[in-house]
């Protein structure tokens, strides 16, 4: 494969989805075609799995079921959308990927990093991003943002207790520390304009020949 895979990661409330929307007009100026996508989702069946995972009514979904639903959606998404684009030499930029499962299910749900790493490898055949942008934010600030900005569309994972969200952030920070060559940490507590500017600066420096 000669494409480029970029993932965006961060706790709920960090604003990475908004940042992706803001940077798209600029990164679509890259020499290669850019394919924006998201997890869970990206293709039809994976989007249906997304609705099951995030529906606040589905309280009977336990931690292991949740993890396996995420991995099933990931496999579908990778096979149908990500791999064909990467094989065609395109730039795939994905809102959440393998590290979300490690942070949320491995750390947040206490299922164990080794278990999640293995399932990620099984679902993706070992595919890893060329670059992962991690949007970091204090847990209390993130939860305030969720309640303020998404009060009318809070999902099942948003409703988790604050302690779970703290474990997710701590997990992310450990993941970032383990692979410093793959990750770039961005301060998501700044203004949206500054976060967008920092994100574009990182991308243009890392992939200078692509712009």
Curated annotation (Swiss-Prot):
Statement: the UniProt record of this protein carries the keyword DNA repair: no
Reaction(s) the record says it catalyses: dTMP + ATP = dTDP + ADP
Enzyme class: transferase
Residues holding ATP: 10-17
Keyword Nucleotide-binding attributed: yes
GO molecular function, a single term: ATP binding
Protein's GO biological process: dTDP biosynthetic process; dTTP biosynthetic process; dUDP biosynthetic process
EC annotation from Swiss-Prot or TrEMBL: 2.7.4.9
GO CC, one annotated term: cytosol
Family: Belongs to the thymidylate kinase family.
UniProt function note: Phosphorylation of dTMP to form dTDP in both de novo and salvage pathways of dTTP synthesis.
NCBIfam families for this protein: DTMP_kinase
Protein name, as recorded: Thymidylate kinase
């Amino acid at each position: 494969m000669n494409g480029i895979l970029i993932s965006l990661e961060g706790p709920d409330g960090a604003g990475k989805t908004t940042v992706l929307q803001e940077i798209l007009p600029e990164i679509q100026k890259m020499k290669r075609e850019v394919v924006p996508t998201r997890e869970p989702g990206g293709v039809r069946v994976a989007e249906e799995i997304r609705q099951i995972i995030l529906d606040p009514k589905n309280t009977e979904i336990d931690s292991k079921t949740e993890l396996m639903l995420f991995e099933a959606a990931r496999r579908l998404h990778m096979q149908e959308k990500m791999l064909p684009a990467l094989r065609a030499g395109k730039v795939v930029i994905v809102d959440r990927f393998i590290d979300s499962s490690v942070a949320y299910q491995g750390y947040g749900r206490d299922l164990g990093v080794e278990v999640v790493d293995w399932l990620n490898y099984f679902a993706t055949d070992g595919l890893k991003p060329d670059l992962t942008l991690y949007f970091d934010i204090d847990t209390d600030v993130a939860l305030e943002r969720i309640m303020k900005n998404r009060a009318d569309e809070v999902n099942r994972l948003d409703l988790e207790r604050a302690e779970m969200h703290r474990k997710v952030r701590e997990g992310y920070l450990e993941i970032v520390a383990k692979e410093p060559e793959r990750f770039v940490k961005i301060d998501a507590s700044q203004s949206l304009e500054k976060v967008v500017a920092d994100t574009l600066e990182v991308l243009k420096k890392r992939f200078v020949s692509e712009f």
